[in-house]
Swiss-Prot record:
Residues forming coiled coils: none
Record-linked Gene3D superfamilies: 1.20.1280.50
Organism whose genome encodes this protein: Arabidopsis thaliana
Highest taxon listed in the record's lineage: Eukaryota
Name by which UniProt lists this protein: Putative F-box protein At5g16285
Matching InterPro entries: F-box-like_dom_sf, F-box_dom
Pfam families, per the entry: F-box
Domain F-box: 1-46
Amino acid sequence: MRIESLLQHDVVERILERLAVNSLPRFKAVSKQWKSTIESQFFQGKHLTHRQQSGDPVVLMVTVYNDDSPHVGSLLLGSRRTRNPTTLII
């Protein structure tokens, strides 16, 4: 199953806002929608504002329940201060 079908796009945007600028180019290859989002002026403004106003959340957790199977996916993002900042289980 593709990640775009597991996560709503607004959740994806919130996650992308919290990533370092130098990591964003590789996420443009995930899908046309992600590429379009990352390249939009609106997203770039939100990303810059987020970086200026906060030091990232300690943890952002998204859990996805899929009706087609009992599989549950989780995405955990830590702040820049955590030792193991990203865990993706989907």
